[in-house]
Each structure stands twice: as C-alpha cells, then as structure tokens.
Regions:
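Regulatory alphaC helix of protein kinase catalytic domains
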Residues: 43-67
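Small/polar, glycine/serine/threonine/aspartate-rich low-complexity segments that form flexible
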Residues: 50-56, 104-172, 307-317, 350, ...
Length: 465
C-alpha cells in the first residue's frame, strides 16, 4: 500500500511556495512602504516585546524584522562606523580653526664693557617680552596671522635716552601659495573626502540594513520550510506505521508474504531518520533566526520554540527585467558607495597633479610700531639732569595712531629637480582612478546579471506552484 500521491503534490507545492518567498527577497521589493531605520547609536523607538505563550515564541515576519532592526549586533556595529565618520568630518573641518599663540620672556644680563660706547664699565640690562598671535588657514591655501609684540628694556648705559623703554608692535602677515597647494580644491581636499567617507559609511549602513532584511526573511522562511518538512516527515512516519500494521494483518491472514513486513519496517526506520534530520534543521533554523534578531543569551529564550505565524504569499514580478535592472543600478547602495569611492580617488589624483607644480609662495608683512618710556635728559658726562615720565601707553598710542609703519613683500620658490616622487604618486593615483572605474563597471554587470537570474528564478518558481 503506497502513501497518498496527493500528499506529495501538496508538499511539493508548499515547499515551492516557500522557496519562491526566499527568491523574492532577492529579486523584488519586499514591501511597498520604505522602512525607516535610525542610524543613531541609541535608536529612539524600541521594538515590541516578544510574545511568549505556552513556552513558545510566537513571531510574525514583521515582528522579526522590527526586532532585528532594533537589536541586531552587526547593525549596531555599523552604527558606530557612522558615528565615527561624522566625527572625522568635524576633524577635517578643524583645519579652519583659529590658532592662538602667546609667550612671555624675562631675561637679565651683566656684560663687561668692550667699548666706551657701551655707556658703562659693566653693562647691566633687564628685558621682558610678551607676544600674542592669532592665525588661521584661508580657503585659498594661504595663512593669515596677526601678532601683537610688546617689550620692556632697562639698562644702566649713560647713552640711553628712554630708560626704561617700552615697545609695542602689531604685525599682519600673509603667506599665500601661488602654484602648489593653491586654491580651495587643494585646501579642502580632506574635508571633501571626509564628507564622501561619511556618505560611504551611510551607504554601508543602508547596505547592512538591506542585507539584514534579506537574511531575516530568508531565516524566517527557512524556519517555516524546516517546520513544514518536519510535519511532512511526521505524517510520512505515521503513514508508514499504518502501512506496517496493515501489512501485518495481511501476513497473518496469509494474503501477503512475510518479507513485506521487513520492507515496511525499513520504511519506518527511514522515516524516523528523516524526522531526526528535520528536527536538526528546525533547531539550526531557529538558532540562526535568534542570532539575526539579536536575542539575549537567555537560556529560556534560546530553549523556547519559535512559532512563525506569517503565511507565505507571493505575487508575480511587476517590473520588466530591464526596468528592474535600471532600478537596481539606481538604488543599490554598494554601487553608490563604489561611485563615491571613485570620486575620492579622483580628488586625490587632482591633488597629486597639483603637487607636480613648483612651490611659489607670496609673503607679505605690514607692521605698526611704537616706542615709549621715561625720557632722560643727560649732561655731557652722561648724568641725568632731567626726565619726562612716559610708559607703555605711549607705545600703544603710537600703534593706534599709525605713526610708524613698515612693510615687507617677498616671493619664495622651491622645486625638486626631477620630482620623481611626486610624478610616481600622481601616476599611481591616476591608475587607482582607472581601477575604480573598471571595478564599478564590473559591479554594474554583476548586479544586472544577479537581477536577471533572480527574476527568472521567481518566474520559474511561480509557474511550478
């Protein structure tokens, strides 16, 4: 007595339908509405708690996806990459931070006279200096500085007119590259690359979300299929046992040879082995789904049976193959990431070409000077006969009134003869751009092939139901 053929047809149809669901996760958009996923390290909304009833975890596909997006550890790792990429942009923008510099110096000297013009047999002098400066990189590649310099000098020389004397000065300094490292593109190369890397990190997050959705759906339907295969195996075992009992009755009445009992016993053993394998597959599918959902290593959660509640439903592809390929090429994050990487390499190649130019820098300085102090009136022998008080405020007033000015303009030039290092780096950068372009074309072809094969598989599976 053979098992009912209708059961086989039903089993084949159900298994094909589940397989069709798995293929659809690769070929077709899984849902009409976009899924919104937070990229923050601490997502604002948590997934709904697990529904545990009768010692089993009851789970729909939507609940599984929500849990995975909220708790999956690999997705959390990618969130850290995004946070680091944002900080890297802030670090790159730091090139435009103002730099404050300052200093204070005190000194005292005692020097024996080397000439009558020293004004004392032992010349004694005390100095004090204070500087404060502010500098910043310019988008053009140059640097601008403002320096405020102050000093105090006191000596025992009889030739000094201002004693103590105070000096103050305001210096405006500009250093501007004219060829190499000139321009916004060269200056902000690191900023643009950091922003592109942030976009690459975002695309990696999108890619991981996409992969996770596919993995969860595959894991969910694999569990559904494994549980169904277990049910089929159990039904087959029950049928084999009933067949064995029927054969036993027929042997007892003499209408069947005893050898048939041995064959039916072998059938029972085979079905029992299939059940062992089916239960093994169910356990593996449950553990894989638990891992994707990021469940805590709680013994109760990992021991509880997972009962999937969603039913397998699928519709035929709505898009023609060529439109599906075009949509994939426009939306696949790995391709967008590859294109952004190529743009980074193009920026690097442009900067390397700039490094082939000579170093020509324009240096310009504009100064405002002032001096003040006690004015001493001396007799012919150098002794002080009168004095007029003065101080640092006199020097500051002269600077503010623009009384004493000065300026300097110059050009600096440097160029390594041969420039082999820069030429080799530029050639390597150009090759990297060409390589990235080829890899991009390869990925486009791979995506198009993958979509065609996936759509064909879905259509074939749909016809097989």
């Amino acid at each position: 007595m053979e098992p009912n053929p209708g059961n086989r047809v039903s089993s084949l149809g159900a298994a094909t339908l589940i397989g069709l669901c798995l293929l659809a996760t690769l070929a077709l958009p899984a849902r009409a509405e976009p899924i919104r996923v937070s990229a923050d390290l601490t997502p604002a909304a948590a997934a709904a708690p697990l529904r545990i009833s009768g010692g089993a975890v009851h789970l729909t596909l939507e609940e599984a996806i929500a849990l995975a997006l909220d708790q999956n550890l690999s997705l959390r790792v990618v969130r850290y990459d995004q946070a680091r990429a944002r900080e890297n942009v802030a670090q790159a923008l730091g090139i435009y931070d103002f730099l404050v510099q300052g200093g204070l110096q005190l000194s005292s000297d005692t020097v024996p006279a080397a000439s009558n013009l020293d004004g004392a047999e032992v010349q004694e002098s005390d100095r004090a200096g204070f500087q404060l400066g502010l500098s910043r990189l310019l988008p053009t590649g140059g640097t601008a500085e403002v320096n405020w310099v102050n000093g105090r000098f006191k000596t025992n020389s009889r030739f000094s007119i201002l004693n103590p004397s105070y000096s103050s000065g305001l210096n405006l300094v500009l250093n501007q590259p004219l060829l190499r490292d000139s321009g916004r593109e060269a200056t902000e190369r690191g900023i643009v690359i950091a922003r592109n890397n942030r976009e690459i990190s975002r695309l990696a997050f999108v890619q991981r979300v996409t992969d996770l959705l596919r993995e969860v759906e595959e894991g969910y339907w694999n569990l559904v299929e494994a549980r169904y295969q277990l049910q089929v195996s159990e039904a087959a075992l029950d049928l084999a046992r009933r067949l064995h009992e029927q054969n036993r009755v027929r042997v007892d009445v003499g209408t069947l040879a005893p050898l048939e009992l041995v064959q039916s016993e072998v059938g029972i053993a085979t079905r029992e082995e299939e059940i062992i394998r089916a239960r093994f597959a169910v356990g593996n599918a449950e553990d894989r789904l638990r891992q994707l959902l990021g469940l805590d290593r709680d013994a109760q959660l990992w021991a509880a049976e997972i009962v999937p509640e969603s039913e397998a439903e699928i519709s035929a592809p709505l898009l023609p193959v060529e439109k599906a390929i075009d949509r994939a090429l426009d939306s696949r994050p790995e391709l967008a990431s590859r294109r952004t990487t190529r743009r980074n390499l193009e920026i690097e190649a442009a900067w390397r070409r700039n490094q082939l130019l000579p170093r020509v820098d324009l240096q310009a300085t504009y100064k405002l000077n002032g001096v003040g102090g006690d004015v001493l009136v001396r007799s012919p022998d150098g002794s002080v006969i009168a004095s007029a008080p003065g101080g640092w405020d006199d020097a500051l007033q002269q600077v503010a009134d623009l009384d004493y000015r000065g300026w300097t303009v110059g050009i600096g030039f440097s160029y390594p003869l041969g420039n082999r290092s820069a030429r080799a780096q530029q050639a390597s950068a150009e090759l990297a751009v060409e390589q990235a372009s080829t890899q991009e074309q390869e990925l486009e072809l791979s995506i198009a092939t993958e979509v065609r094969m996936a759509v064909r598989a879905v259509e074939a599976a749909a016809k097989a139901i």
